[in-house]
Swiss-Prot record:
The chain crosses the membrane at residues 230-250. GO terms for cellular component: cis-Golgi network; Golgi apparatus; Golgi membrane. Keywords: Acetylation, Coiled coil, ER-Golgi transport, Golgi apparatus, Membrane, Phosphoprotein, Protein transport, Transmembrane, Transmembrane helix, Transport. It comes from Mus musculus. Residues 37-59 are annotated as: Disordered. CDD domains: SNARE_GS28. Belongs to the GOSR1 family. This is Golgi SNAP receptor complex member 1. Residues 9-27, 72-93 form a coiled coil. The modification N-acetylalanine is found at residue 2. The gene is Gosr1. The modification Phosphoserine is found at residue 141. It holds the Pfam family V-SNARE_C. It is found in: Golgi apparatus membrane.
Amino acid sequence: MAAGTSNYWEDLRKQARQLENELDLKLVSFSKLCTSYSHSGSRDGGRDRYSSDTTPLLNGSSQDRMFETMAIEIEQLLARLTGVNDKMAEYTHSAGVPSLNAALMHTLQRHRDILQDYTHEFHKTKANFTAIRERENLMGSVRKDIESYKSGSGVNNRRTELFLKEHDHLRNSDRLIEETISIAMATKENMTSQRGMLKSIHSKMNTLANRFPAVNSLIQRINLRKRRDSLILGGVIGICTILLLLYAFH
């Protein structure tokens, strides 16, 4: 019976790790899609993306369709991972050994933290993508109105020229801001990856220490002996220094 329940727990952990790996890859691609969408809008200048009056989500550009598809896939993966975490929680409550329960709860909390981080990252990237698309819609509409005004009136007065120059200046500033945001997002991805690696190393060290108390005790004794040797060495150096000073000023 114990072997069966242990296998069930390991199967749940395996499913959770597999879903977490899939979500990590999906979120990286999702973030890159958001960045490429922004750069594409800057290069196009709003001319090709807004050839019609409306740009619905599913009938717009290929990037819009890809965004919708990836968002649905990530939401499904998050839902599946949530279900696996719920099953793991039920298992921890049904387990009868207190010491085993503590270890299981620690593992469950770690998977819950990962799920929370992935959910937060998904919603943040999705909101950024929506904001960029709305801004591109607005800029494209302004560009279209300007072109319509120029073609309709046929007059290039100084006010229109100044407005166009100001518009181009704003677009250049917006592009610089987007590039800065892209660099920041890439840096955040690297920091998130490093944090995950550190968490994994810390968890493995804790697991090793819990499984092998003798190793943990040996490490503690080594650390105590190092501190003791450092104190002795410091005392010897201090005494020698005092003796040298007394000898020098004698």
